[in-house]
């Protein structure tokens, strides 16, 4: 979930849900099933017609509306499915389609009859686009992400008369409500997603070609794994993102990037590691909240380890190797600046001691920390080393 470009898995197989939706919309159009799926409030009183609240998104009665929906599925739908996972993409699409139908029926009951009576997948496209509160990898100096669904709404009105404007607006409002957390109680839990993805059907579809079920990024089944020291994975992995449970059991410098010794890690390296890991935590699913306490405890344990440095005798002006991105991130979450937090960690070697220095205001922003333990950090109070 880090770029607009399709990930590598897309070049090997197509996303299952979006591709099947394209086939389904085309088949229903050829069969002429659009009128029987349109959102008709007067028919919803019959028990067998309640399905229209959901299936109104699958029917089309106008060719321009169908072509626009089909065009957006391989462009927008594939990207969303790759970054949400197939199961979460299907779940979100169904929830937003149902919310759009209910909102349209509500407006029709209030006297706005044009809010219902149509069909088409465009309201779901608008809802999914508006429901993304932030777009990872969105290029800088371009249109703001919140403007995209409104531009798509205007484009739809220019190119097609189906569905009606109020029904499209209902889809957009449903997406905005989703982004605001109105449907959070309907979200699939990480445990539920894991159980579904470990099922026989999902595992079979995940290995199919050319259509493939994509796992949910960041789910328990997608957690990073730890590689033995000296063994590099086939695809590059960012430093400091290997499993934190390996810290107490592996060499202290096994997490450094290839070619960098303990004394060659500069402030820019640490900041670049934090920048890489930042979007991953920002867009993480609730699974990270459940593991937050465990990661904090392991980070504190790792900070208490006294790593002896075997290197040259010359003084190197760089942060201590024990200053890791995770500990810096813990202090950042507490509201401390990055530079001062790193200096305090290098001076004390402990998270608790760093917090004490920062709270008392003893850390100088211009301080440099040597690799040797006896080399004091330059603080405002010369008595602190």
Swiss-Prot record:
Which biological processes are named by the entry's GO terms?
A: liver development; MAPK cascade; negative regulation of natural killer cell activation; positive regulation of protein catabolic process; regulation of acute inflammatory response; regulation of protein secretion; response to xenobiotic stimulus
> What molecular function does GO assign, one term?
serine-type endopeptidase activity
- State the annotated membrane topology for this chain: Multi-pass membrane protein
Where in the cell?
Membrane
Where would you say this protein principally sits, based on its record?
A: membrane
Q: Which residue ranges does UniProt annotate as crossing the membrane?
A: 13-33, 58-78, 93-113, 146-166, 168-188
Residue ranges annotated for the UBA domain, each copy included: 322-361
Entry's Gene Ontology cellular component terms = membrane
Q: Which domain of life does this protein belong to?
A: Eukaryota
Q: Which Pfam family, giving just one, matches this sequence?
A: UBA
Q: Keyword Transmembrane helix, does the record have it? A: yes
Q: Which UniProt keywords apply?
A: Membrane, Transmembrane, Transmembrane helix
Q: Supply the PANTHER family for this chain.
A: RHOMBOID DOMAIN-CONTAINING PROTEIN 3 (PTHR43066:SF16), RHOMBOID-RELATED PROTEIN (PTHR43066)
Q: What is this protein called in UniProt?
A: Rhomboid domain-containing protein 3
């Amino acid at each position: 979930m880090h770029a607009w470009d399709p990930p590598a898995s897309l070049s090997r197989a197509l996303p299952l849900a979006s591709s099947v939706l394209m086939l389904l919309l085309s088949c229903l159009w050829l069969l002429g099933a659009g009128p029987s799926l349109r959102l008709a409030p007067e028919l919803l009183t019959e028990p067998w017609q309640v399905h229209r609240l959901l299936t109104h998104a699958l029917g089309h009665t106008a060719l321009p509306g169908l072509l626009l929906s089909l065009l957006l599925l391989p462009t927008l739908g594939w990207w969303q499915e790759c970054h949400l996972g197939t199961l979460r993409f299907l779940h979100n699409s169904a929830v937003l389609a149902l919310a759009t139908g209910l909102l349209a029926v509500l407006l029709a009951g209030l006297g706005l009859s044009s809010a219902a009576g149509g069909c088409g997948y465009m309201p779901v496209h608008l809802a999914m686009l508006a429901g993304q509160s932030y777009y990872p990898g969105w290029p800088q100096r371009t249109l703001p992400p919140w403007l995209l669904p409104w531009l798509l709404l205007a484009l739809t009105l220019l190119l097609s008369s189906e569905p009606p404007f109020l029904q499209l607006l209902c889809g957009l409002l449903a997406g905005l409500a989703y982004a605001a957390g109105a449907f959070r109680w309907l979200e699939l839990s990480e445990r539920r997603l894991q159980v579904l993805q470990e099922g026989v059907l999902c595992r079979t579809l995940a290995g199919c070609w050319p259509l493939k079920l994509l796992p949910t990024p960041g789910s328990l089944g997608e957690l990073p794994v730890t590689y033995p020291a000296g063994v590099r994975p086939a695809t590059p992995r960012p430093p400091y993102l290997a499993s934190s449970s390996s810290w107490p059991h592996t060499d202290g410098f096994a997490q450094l990037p290839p070619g960098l010794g303990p004394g060659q890690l500069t402030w820019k390296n640490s900041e670049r590691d934090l920048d890489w890991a930042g979007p991953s935590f920002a867009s993480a699913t609730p699974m990270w909240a459940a593991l937050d306490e465990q990661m904090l405890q392991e980070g504190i344990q790792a900070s208490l380890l006294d790593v002896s440095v075997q290197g040259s005798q010359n003084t190197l002006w760089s942060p201590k190797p024990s200053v890791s991105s995770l500990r810096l991130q813990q202090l950042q979450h507490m509201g401390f600046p990055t530079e001062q937090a790193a200096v305090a960690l290098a001076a004390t070697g402990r998270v608790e001691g760093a917090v004490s220095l920062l709270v008392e205001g003893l850390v100088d922003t211009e301080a440099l920390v040597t690799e040797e333990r006896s080399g004091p950090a330059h603080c405002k109070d010369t008595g602190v080393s």
